[in-house]
């Protein structure tokens, strides 16, 4: 058995060496699908503050909720693609939302809508179109929980502007005045992806985690195969970290927008297209496909429901569907 684990570990480290700009995963056994839900373990030191549990019968009260977001691919370009075998293994092994629709085009207003409940009339990938409004992080902090966004290849915490592989338009948090204009808050919560391993090692992972790959690993500028290889390493890192504490978690894999303009759920008739969204958790149904129509606002609404937070913007709309069917 030890020889088998060492062989698997060597394979994982070899993959990591081929992707030098990725966050370096801790020394762990490489993830296969059966490891995504770790065996029951005990812990005496939680990763994040444990708020008072919120009684809820609709959505589980997860200790950690993670969003990992990729770029610009329609559902049919991802599901069934031989270039994304790992993503498709996860999609077939856990819960796949088959009718999830992005908010609009281009990228930025989709990101903004995921945490703000609105596009705030942003119609471009502007870098100076800041918003003075309440966002999901405000509500998370008010509930006694913590949050961070980990941005791959961001030069330093709270960085303004874009670089070669980090682009500001894929970081919605920096656009909200209450975050950006509070220097201490911004520096603590908008951080490079390299900070993830530091937080894992110190057992200080926040309750809400938003991970943006760089412009290559998100499949924006590079191929789906590179995004898939990056995802495999990232999933290994996250799941082993959560498994070490046995804290309930939900990982949401999604895409900012598709390549079409399909719509649902009260969105404009011409919206952001159909995207592939996968829910991964010990508390989701396995091998399940949910054909309920959802939008990005549904993700925001579901996070709010899980943690007893107020609904922001269009998350409160009756047409915005709450994600219920996938939970065990």
Which sequence ranges carry the predicted segments?
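C-terminal motif of bacterial Sec signal peptides marking the signal peptidase cleavage site
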Residues: 15-17
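Positively charged n-region of N-terminal signal peptides that target proteins for export
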Residues: 1-4
